[in-house]
């Protein structure tokens, strides 16, 4: 974290995260696929009060409508990856990763188990709406990813997921975070369809 001039933050009232923090990792974003579930009421593991997705439970009978890239998100927030993406993770010996093969293709639902702790309260870098006392989450959380100051990274080569789910209601999902060295390796491996966005800390 860079030295922060608190007076300057107060004066402009719009803190710029890139001005006060360093880029320490990247999130993975991809092209959009059709929804895995038709209708919000059919998405599993929603809070019954605010309808936020609390856990990603894939339908393994899902058929991707695009198959030319290595990394996708469905429009309802499920990460779908290719066999090549899985090969990259296997060859790199990245641990604590969940790959569930889809029944009709050589694609997988993908989610890391290792948690990247985030700070969601840097406004306006993040926007959050509708706090739910039942599930202890915001029904809407949008914006970028900022590392929590208490969370220490021990390596620059990792694949994790955020502790918070980003997005709105049933479409929320954890963001996948990789180290800067991992980003380089993914590019060298030739993985297609991945957009890398900055993670600050």
Stretch-by-stretch model annotation:
Residues 1-201:
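Phosphate/anion-contacting hairpin/loop surfaces
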């Amino acid at each position: 974290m860079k030295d922060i001039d608190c007076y300057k933050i107060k004066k402009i009232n719009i803190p710029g995260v890139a001005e006060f923090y360093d880029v320490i990792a990247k999130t993975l974003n991809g092209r959009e696929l059709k929804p895995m579930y038709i209708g919000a009421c059919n998405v599993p593991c929603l809070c019954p009060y605010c309808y936020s997705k609390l856990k990603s439970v894939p339908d393994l009978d899902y058929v991707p409508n695009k198959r030319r890239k290595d990394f996708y998100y469905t429009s309802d927030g499920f990460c779908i990856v290719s066999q090549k993406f899985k090969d990259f993770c296997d060859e790199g010996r990245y641990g604590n990763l969940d790959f569930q093969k889809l029944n009709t293709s050589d694609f997988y639902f993908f989610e890391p188990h290792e948690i990247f702790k985030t700070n969601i309260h840097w406004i306006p870098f993040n926007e959050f709406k509708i706090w739910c006392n039942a599930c202890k989450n915001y029904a809407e959380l949008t914006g970028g990813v900022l590392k929590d100051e208490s969370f220490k990274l021990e390596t620059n080569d990792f694949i994790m997921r955020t502790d918070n789910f980003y997005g709105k209601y049933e479409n929320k999902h954890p963001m996948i975070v990789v180290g800067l060295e991992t980003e380089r390796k993914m590019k060298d491996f030739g993985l297609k369809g991945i957009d890398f966005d900055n993670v600050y800390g």
